[in-house]
Structure formats: structure tokens, C-alpha cells
Amino acid sequence: MSDYLVAALYKFVSLPNYESLREPLIDFCQSREIKGTLLLAAEGINGTVAGTPEAIQALLEELRRQPGLDALEHKESVATEQPFYRLKIKLKKEIVTMGVEGIDPNLVVGTYVAPAEWNALISDPDVTVIDTRNDYEYEIGTFRGAVNPNTQSFRQLPQYVAENLDPNKHKKVAMFCTGGIRCEKSTALMKQMGFEEVYHLQGGILKYLEEVPEGNSLWDGECFVFDNRVSVKHGLEEGSYELCHGCRFPINETDKQSDKYIKGVACPRCYDEQTPEQRSRFLERQKQMELASRKGELHIGDRADIAKSRTTQGAPSADGE
């Protein structure tokens, strides 16, 4: 089959009847073999989906026909294999979970900065640059000079801001995330807390990697994505990272050279934390996956097993939280 089209999308907009969208969208996507995750809430829609180019374009057109979603924006990339195992369309309280009441990006948000103008902003010594993503995302790539809040989930960012940033000291703050959605809420939070000059990267890291040539880039490393590609590089090409099936954290070639790496079972991060029972279960799961692979079958049960048996706090969530 030809390459799959991957579409990352979100829109903060009032969707009072969001619950009624779920079943029709499930039917629409299943009939076109679209896979991925869509989150629906009263505050809008968020998700990443993949399928044939024709199927994804049809879905985007269908979404834009819904009241309030006519201006829905999305970012596209390509995957050589279907990057999702299944389709999930969820009803949520928030489309990206911060856990702070009263934050509405439709009312107030930071100043958008286009990728072409981002380098100049973050090169300003008076600007504090904050990576709003989680620790494991920061580890594999970030912008030069960016601060790592050391969060394990987006819910922890408000506490970091309250304890480490001061409107009287940090006059200019620039924030960025994968696709832009977390910055919508984080900059809205900052504005509510009294920070006056707050900026965020329009379209997120993905748009920057798509538009800014590598030779001019201030991005170091790769960008974690919440699908089976694991990471992408400049030009949105598939990256070099894989997921450890024991803890769901990204691993590279150096990790795989470790004595504590067991394919499909453990990596240096989680090896010492696994119980004998977990190790045995993971080994059996890997055996079944390899058998399915040799038969040309897709072993999709592993993701459910992994989700139940995470051994490390803060493992990546498919929802990007």
C-alpha cells in the first residue's frame, strides 16, 4: 500500500452537542479504515488520525461541516505504515487535560509566533523559553536554551508555573509544544496569572520542523509523537526512536546496546523496576507478537496489555497529556 496520511488537528470551540458527534464519527471512520484518536468535549476537538489520503481528506471535510468547526486547522505528515492500531473516539471533560477550572483559550491566549519568526524570539536573552511538554518528550529533543519543567503530565505544569515563574521577573515568556494545543491552555493560564508578554509557537514543533530548513533550525534532536512512529525529524520524516514495550518510553540505539535492554520487554529505564511476574508476562507477549509477525498478522492486544502493566510513572499517553 502507498504511504498513510497522518492528520493532527484541534480546535477550541464551544461544542454543546459534542456527545452526539461520537457515533456518527465512529461509523464514518470505520467505513474508511481510519485509525487514531479523537477527543470530543464541550470545549472542542483534539486528535491525530491516519488513513489513506482520500479517507483523511473526507474526514476533514466532514468535520468542517459541523457547526463551529468550519475553521478547523490541521497539520499533515506521512507514515510508511499505519501508525495506529485502532480507532478511539472519546468523550472528555477537556480536550487536553490541565485540570484548572476557568481556563478558556477562546477568551484569552498568548501571542502566536510563526515558525519563520520563532528563532528571533527565542534568541532574545530577555525571553524565558518554556517547553510545556513532558520530561520524556524533552529528553529526545527540544529548542536550544529551553527550560525543562520536569513534568510527568500536563496537569503538573500549573504548579511549575506557580512555583517557578513570576510576572514581575519573567517579563517575556515563550512557550511551545508538539502541535500547539497545550500552549493554547498554558498561555491562557499565564495571562490569567498576570503575565503580560506571553508568546507561543504557532502550529507547534511539528509546523516548525515542516517549514524551517534544518540548516537554519534551533531545534536539537527529534520530536516525540503519540503514535507508532514515536518520533519525527526535520521535514517531518520518521525518526530513529522506538518505544520500550515494558514502560512505553522512547528508546534509541544507545539504549538498545545496554545489558538492561530486552527487546519488547525492558529497557534501562524500567529493567530494575519490573517484577518477575511482569518480566515473564512481557516475554510471553513478545513471543506472541513475533509469532504473529511471522504469520503476517497484526498483534493488537499488546497495547492494551502494556497500558495495564506500565511500570514507570508518567509513561506516554496516547492522548498527549
Swiss-Prot record:
SUPFAM superfamilies: Rhodanese/Cell cycle control phosphatase. One of its GO terms (biological process) is tRNA modification. Residues 294-321 are annotated as: Disordered. NCBIfam families: PRK00142.1-4. The keyword ATP-binding does not apply. Residues 294-308 have a biased composition (Basic and acidic residues). Its EC number is 1.14.-.-. It catalyses: uridine(34) in tRNA + AH2 + O2 = 5-hydroxyuridine(34) in tRNA + A + H2O. This is tRNA uridine(34) hydroxylase. The keyword tRNA processing applies. It comes from Teredinibacter turnerae (strain ATCC 39867 / T7901). Catalyzes oxygen-dependent 5-hydroxyuridine (ho5U) modification at position 34 in tRNAs. Belongs to the TrhO family. One of its GO terms (molecular function) is oxidoreductase activity, acting on paired donors, with incorporation or reduction of molecular oxygen. Keywords: Oxidoreductase, tRNA processing. Signal peptide: none annotated. Residues 123-217 form the Rhodanese domain. InterPro entries: Rhodanese-like_dom, Rhodanese-like_dom_sf, TrhO, TRHO_N. The active site is at 177 (cysteine persulfide intermediate).
